[in-house]
Amino acid sequence: MAKLGKISDENQKLVDEAIVKTGLNNYMNIRCLSIAKQKPVIKVSRANATTEYVGKLSDTVFLYIKENVFDMLETPQKIMVVQDALSQVSYDIEKDKILITKPEICVGLESYRIYGESIIKTMEAAYMAQQAIDEAEREKKAAERENKKKK
């Protein structure tokens, strides 16, 4: 099992400021833990039912930070990494539910080294094209349902 611990006060303050800026603290508890063995520098995870029950931590999301790597970053880079991780977390007010999504754009490091910023813009264009196709399909299905109701 991975060894978990408390993150440094300096890093906790930085993360807390980022959380407050997002407003997520109004809808859920976000806890930060230091973890020694994980691949990503930062990982977002929802507390499971056992954790919520035993720890009395309802509506809790954990940020697992690989602190030895995180501490090698400059403060602006740390903020960027935390904000990127928090961008995966949202709260659906209508359904009263915490949502954790995967990033819309994933780019391999080798592709980024070769193409630079243009790969990001290309992947964004591809994502937007897919969104347009999905929206057109939803509209088409809605129109078909309306036509069936009219008949």
Regions found by a protein language model. Name each.
Residues 1-56, 69:
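A metal-dependent hydrolase signature that marks the N-terminal structural subdomain at the beginning
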Residues 27-33, 92-97, 142:
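Short glycine-rich, low-complexity/disordered patches
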Residues 29-35, 62-64, 80:
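Ordered hydrophobic segments in well-structured contexts
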Residues 40-43, 60-65, 87:
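Subset of Sec-pathway N-terminal targeting signals
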Residues 47-76, 92:
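Active-site scaffold of zinc-dependent metalloenzymes
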Residues 79-92:
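Active-site recognition of the HExxH zinc-binding catalytic motif
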Residues 92-138:
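Post-HExxH zinc-binding segment in Zn-dependent metallohydrolases
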Residues 136-151:
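Short acidic DE-rich linear segments
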